[in-house]
């Protein structure tokens, strides 16, 4: 049996869409802007804290060695740039599956880290997650695809429950 978390990474790398959200944006070029770049402030207040940038690295992966390698790279980028990072679902760590693939604050002490678990988890598991991770915030995710089994053949992907 393959590791579902590793499957997520493999599918994300293999099945890519030519579309991205930037396709929906139109940037209007003004060769002589009327604003002072020193007056632009991207900072924001979120989760009880002030942030330099109005975005963060959202939950990606965790729970496997391959996911841990991805998270380590994301943690390094987040730490170096001051961007918050949200780990993948901490549910795997609560089961004892590679909890080290979620928290990189020993290696990157300046890392601002949040974590998430599925909305189907109990309040007790949410409390255990917060106690284990001491995150900036706990994010709940709704993942309708998790109970589905993914099968592939050549270039086709199908989902069954």
Regions inferred by a protein language model and the residue ranges of each:
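An N-cap/entry alpha-helix motif that binds or orients negatively charged groups
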Residues: 1-47, 51
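Active-site beta-loop-alpha junctions enriched in small/polar residues
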Residues: 60-62, 90-92, 116-120, 143-145
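Low-complexity, flexible helical/coil segments
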Residues: 16, 35, 89-97, 120-126, ...
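Aromatic- and Gly/Pro-rich donor/ligand-binding loops
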Residues: 19-23, 59-66, 90
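Glycine-rich, positively charged N-terminal anion/phosphate-binding segment
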Residues: 30-47, 66-75, 83, 87-108
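Alpha/beta enzyme core
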Residues: 75-80, 107-108, 113, 120-161
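N-terminal small/glycine-rich loop or linker at the start of catalytic domains
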Residues: 47-58, 145-149
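Hydrophobic faces of well-ordered beta-strands that scaffold small-molecule active sites
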Residues: 55-58, 83-88, 113-117, 138-140
């Amino acid at each position: 049996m393959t590791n579902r978390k590793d499957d997520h990474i493999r599918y994300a790398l293999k099945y890519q869409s030519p579309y991205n959200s930037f396709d929906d944006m139109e940037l209007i070029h003004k060769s002589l802007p009327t604003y002072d770049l020193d007056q632009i402030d991207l900072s924001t207040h979120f989760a009880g804290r002030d942030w330099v940038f109005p975005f963060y690295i959202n939950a990606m992966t965790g729970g496997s060695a391959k996911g841990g390698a991805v998270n380590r790279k994301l943690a390094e980028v987040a730490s170096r740039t001051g961007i918050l990072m949200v780990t993948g679902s901490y549910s795997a760590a609560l089961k004892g599956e590679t909890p080290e693939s979620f928290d990189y604050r020993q290696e990157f002490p300046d890392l601002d880290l949040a974590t998430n678990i599925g909305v189907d988890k109990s309040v007790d598991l949410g409390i255990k997650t917060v106690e284990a991770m001491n995150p900036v915030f706990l994010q709940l995710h709704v993942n309708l695809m998790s109970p589905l089994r993914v099968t592939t053949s050549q270039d086709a992907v199908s989902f069954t429950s």
